[in-house]
Every structure is written in C-alpha cells, then in structure tokens.
C-alpha cells in the first residue's frame, strides 16, 4: 500500500493559498481516480482506493501545516506502510512556479510541515514531490506570500502544475524511483 500526503492548512480561508498546493494536488488526484476523501481520523482527511491497481491512501492532515507529522505517523502505523511507500507533496519557495521535482530525501529546507514530518517519522529519508511557488516579490514577506491566495491570472499555471503533479503522483504508485526522477526532474 502507498500513502500520498498533501501538505496544507485546513479551512476555507486557506483553500487557495500557495501553502495549500499539496492539498489542491491531493484533491485533484482523488477526483481523477474516484477516491472519496471522506474519512476523518488521525487528525486527517483521508480516502483509500486504487491507483494503477495498487492500494493507496490519500491524506490531507488537518493539524495545520506546522504539525503535519502528528497526523501522518499514526496513519503509516495503522496501515503498516513503510517509509519507502510514502510520498509527500508540498510547496517549495525556491522553485519557480509551475516547476515540479521529485526528491528521495532531504532536510526541511525551512519548511515547517516537512520539519514536523521529519520529527515524527524519525527520518528525513522519505520521498517528496515539490511544487514550485517561487519567492515573493519585494516587499512581501515569505510568511505573507505562502498564505496569499493565488491571483486570477496565476490560475492557468496553477491548473497546469496540478495536472502535472497528479500525473507524477499517479506514476509514483507503480514506477521505479530512478525512472520517475529521470522522467520528471
């Protein structure tokens, strides 16, 4: 079984913010594969189903970004999912908008959601799909930028990014990791 987690913040006011691109990707992935995100447990909204014939659980932690690990660890334990079968989708300030990149492991890089996951999983060696949101233009602060809604003129690029993320996450389920990185990076 695979676990695909999208990071974000719960609630209507955060729905279309840059920090919620992981949630948006999970919503679109669930829709594409007919998986209902209707199970609320372990401080997360989740749904189970099949992608490319493999069992998956899709997860949106409801703990707020900075505490994401509190939701993910119990889910992995409950379903007996190995760290190697986990993919985390999240926003990356240091990548241009529209770009996506798989990473096999790494530091938190200043991302508090990833920091929480590393703390609760006890390792930084979990797979990631980073979606670029870019750095804020001067004088906007990073904290304000990530919690800002996408502008209307940014929505076509966001939709393309989410479509690409769904394709990439779908491929994660049954594609060799090196082939996946070669294809998308």
Curated annotation (Swiss-Prot):
Catalytic activity: an N-acyl-L-alpha-aminoacyl-tRNA + H2O = an N-acyl-L-amino acid + a tRNA + H(+)
Subunit note: Monomer.
Physiological role: Hydrolyzes ribosome-free peptidyl-tRNAs (with 1 or more amino acids incorporated), which drop off the ribosome during protein synthesis, or as a result of ribosome stalling.
Matching SUPFAM superfamilies: Peptidyl-tRNA hydrolase-like (SSF53178)
EC number: 3.1.1.29
Binding annotation for tRNA: 14, 64, 66, 112
Residues under site feature: Discriminates between blocked and unblocked aminoacyl-tRNA: 9
UniProt cross-references to InterPro entries, sorted A to Z: Pept_tRNA_hydro (IPR001328), Pept_tRNA_hydro_CS (IPR018171), Pept_tRNA_hydro_sf (IPR036416)
Identification of the protein by name: Peptidyl-tRNA hydrolase
Sites marked Stabilizes the basic form of H active site to accept a proton: 91
GO molecular function: peptidyl-tRNA hydrolase activity; tRNA binding
Active site residues according to the UniProt entry: 19
Organism: Exiguobacterium sp. (strain ATCC BAA-1283 / AT1b)
Any one cellular-component term (Gene Ontology): cytoplasm
Source superkingdom: Bacteria
Keywords, ordered alphabetically: Cytoplasm, Hydrolase, RNA-binding, tRNA-binding
Keyword Ribonucleoprotein applies: no
Subcellular location: Cytoplasm
GO process annotations (BP): protein quality control for misfolded or incompletely synthesized proteins; rescue of stalled ribosome
Family named by the database record: Belongs to the PTH family.
């Amino acid at each position: 079984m695979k676990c695909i987690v999208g990071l974000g913040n719960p609630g209507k006011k955060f729905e279309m913010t840059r920090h919620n691109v992981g949630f948006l990707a999970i919503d679109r992935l669930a829709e594409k594969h007919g998986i209902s995100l209707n199970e609320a447990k372990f401080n997360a909204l989740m749904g189970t189903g099949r992608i490319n014939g493999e069992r998956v659980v899709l997860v949106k932690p409801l703990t707020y970004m900075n505490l994401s690990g509190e939701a993910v660890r119990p889910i992995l334990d409950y379903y007996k999912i190995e760290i190697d079968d986990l993919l985390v989708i999240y926003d990356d300030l240091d990548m241009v908008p529209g770009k996506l990149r798989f990473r096999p492991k790494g530091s938190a890089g200043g991302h508090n959601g990833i920091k929480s996951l590393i703390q609760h999983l006890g390792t930084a060696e979990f797979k990631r799909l980073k979606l670029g949101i870019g750095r804020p233009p001067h004088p906007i602060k990073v904290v304000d930028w990530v919690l800002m809604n996408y502008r209307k003129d940014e929505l076509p690029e966001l939709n393309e990014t989410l479509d690409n993320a769904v394709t990439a996450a779908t491929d994660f389920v049954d594609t060799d990791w090196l082939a996946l990185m070669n294809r998308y990076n």
